[in-house]
Amino acid sequence: MSRSATIRSVTEWHIVVDLSRRRVTVYRAGHRVRVFKAVVGKPSTPTPQGEFFVEESIALRAGDVGAPFALALSARSNVLQEFDGGPGQIALHGLANIGGVLGTAVSHGCVRLADDTMRWLVARVGPGVPVTITS
């Protein structure tokens, strides 16, 4: 599917990542539910912009980078063809074992959120939820 194709979803959830504000806003049925501070990609490895969707929800082990959870997106890095042995896939994930101050641009392209935020998100959203990443 081309990135210019319309993404349709039957879910009432929608996630919007605002790169300039370094915020993630979660909507349900068109109403804003929560807004979270985030870490986004640094200038050399920016978070790609566009219309994407959650491909899968992954529970990570306590020692894993990005634990406790990751929401893998259909987005791919425009810079990194691979990362940490895998494809340059973009995800929303926790801060465990990787850090970064919320509200900064220091990641390799993924969107990092507080661990409690990730627990809240994975309890509500899953595969198919649309994700808009914009500046």
Please provide the spans of the model-predicted regions.
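Exported/periplasmic cell-wall-interacting domains
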Residues: 2-12, 42-51, 58-135
